[in-house]
């Protein structure tokens, strides 16, 4: 992560409106990862990440920050839902599978990077194999030195190969069918019970390694053959052991885990009875966040320096209802604010690929023009805010519901009205939505 905190915040600003405190917190945490790696090894071991707890109502940008962060991190990043895990000993996924999944992400990232580095060599090798299929080598004659008459034939054959190579690179042979030898991959899936993903993965690995030595003849178009053979050649050129060791080191030093909906595993005050998806999961999470060693199929992983970012709405439970040890492991608390009508106006217009832009571009594919006036957007934002205020506040997600309702008729009829256009102004918004927005019973179910 070579981006500065200011650059990270600026990048997040392109997609997320407001919530500057949360953006600054994650920007500092990401930059601290880079700062730590510049230190000597002895001091580096002593500096642990400061985990972050993001608190805020639903639909204000917590999950969106995680999504955009994964693009910026350039490090192994995993987003998981806390509700998907159960206490060790019960049927379901245990929390250690978080680290196993993170390692899988890191291995995939490292392999893709290694393949990019050998891409040109792999493409050359694939090209030679395709040329061999297009121009089979001349049949062998008598043993010994070639005669004077045969030597020009060799030159001619070489010239033919050059001609085909040129045609191949120009894409003139893309649709021609050839027969090539490719690796035979197993065509079956192993299904396993919940919580047994690791064993299933190992079984599939064994089956794949057994069948990867075999090859089979396939008839393919040249462009498909180049792609498949290129992947095969790249796989031969990369060092799998090096990929695994690099991935493990990357997880240990730079891994980031985003735990969403952590408030849903908090045991509420006054609740009685065992709940395997709540306090037990918190206690299982504790060793991971504190620092422990997890066994994965690629080797042992120490979690001491993995950064954990948790988020939750906490509208029923409070952060103080988390088990005390876990509270202490999330020293940075960030509160995200509820969105206002002005925020909704900005969400509809400012972010990259905003909602209004998405609908405009979608209908443009039907040769139908769609545009929004300022007063139309303002009225949309007001209705979204009013409905949130009167019923359940679901934040910016309300805009998706309202936009779908507003443009339902336009989207349906756009195909029959190619070449036409429509402008969404305040009057059009009122005509389509006012009655629904004012009727509390209707808005509760429809908007």
Curated annotation (Swiss-Prot):
Where is this chain compositionally biased, Basic and acidic residues type?
148-159
Q: What are the GO BP annotations of this UniProt entry?
A: protein unfolding; proteolysis involved in protein catabolic process
Primary location group: cytoplasm
Which compartments does it reside in?
A: Cytoplasm
Q: Which domain of life is it from?
A: Bacteria
Residues reported to bind ATP: 17, 59-64, 260, 325, 397
Q: Which UniProt keywords apply?
A: ATP-binding, Chaperone, Cytoplasm, Nucleotide-binding, Stress response
The entry lists its GO molecular-function terms as:
ATP binding; ATP hydrolysis activity; peptidase activity; proteasome-activating activity
Q: Where is this region: Disordered?
A: 136-160
Q: Which GO terms describe its cellular component?
A: HslUV protease complex
Role summary: ATPase subunit of a proteasome-like degradation complex; this subunit has chaperone activity. The binding of ATP and its subsequent hydrolysis by HslU are essential for unfolding of protein substrates subsequently hydrolyzed by HslV. HslU recognizes the N-terminal part of its protein substrates and unfolds these before they are guided to HslV for hydrolysis.
Known partners and oligomeric status: A double ring-shaped homohexamer of HslV is capped on each side by a ring-shaped HslU homohexamer. The assembly of the HslU/HslV complex is dependent on binding of ATP.
Family stated for the protein in its record: Belongs to the ClpX chaperone family. HslU subfamily.
Q: What is this protein called?
A: ATP-dependent protease ATPase subunit HslU
Q: Which species?
A: Coxiella burnetii (strain RSA 331 / Henzerling II)
